[in-house]
Amino acid sequence: MPRAVLYVDLDGTVARSPMPRVIRRAYEVLASLSGLSVQQVEGVAWAIHLELASRSLPQAFDWDYIFERVASELGVRAEFSVEREFSTVCPESVALDNSPEVLRELGRSGYTLILATNGLMKYQRCVIETLGLDRYFSYIYTPDNRGCLKNCREFYAPPEGVDSGLPAVSVGDNYTFDVYFPKLFGLLTVHVVRSTREDPYLALVRRPGAGLGRLGGLDLLPEADASVRNFGESAVAVGRLLEDFHRRFRS
């Protein structure tokens, strides 16, 4: 029996892809056609993206869908495919922090590894195959096969045949999707801290009706169960968390 289920993020955690560059190019195309600045186009796209993400819809991370939505709002037409453009540069994707070796170590430690990403499979498949990451994971969870994003409880339902009573751990670099929501759903969390800047996706938990508590004018944001500086430190962090978990369970 596995010791625990680990939901491991992809982008920014175990790998970095050129997708941001492709999205930026898409916005430049729309800016050129509309006469707006790239920053203005980004603002329109972000509003659409955030609204979809607030409803946990997979289209929030369908960059071709968002491109078409923005083009429609701006009253322009453009022939641009994010998926096609990304496929030409995807081989530039790189593994971070010797992540294949870390994943191999986690697998040997008896954990069931699930690659858990908000990216759609039509974009992520190339990254996964380029870096050979599929060999380390028993399952791959994406919004298009889960029906929602990582801010919905159903995303984390264990696979068929995996004991739902096993401890579950989220490992990732995005505070909102890899720490805040997983903790809300009862998972342990390991935050791979890549930046000290505030996560812009906190806008999702600060929306009216989102239920975020406040005290003395400050948001009551839960801390990760463990924070690490890079993915390479996550194996030790996960081991310690689970030792503490089982110690509390026995007592």
Where are these regions (language model features)?
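Asp-based, Mg2+/Mn2+-dependent phosphohydrolase catalytic module
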Residues: 1-2, 100, 104, 114, ...
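Short, flexible/disordered intra-domain loops and linkers
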Residues: 19-21, 52-59, 197-210
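Active-site neighborhood of HAD-like aspartate-dependent phosphohydrolases
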Residues: 1-44
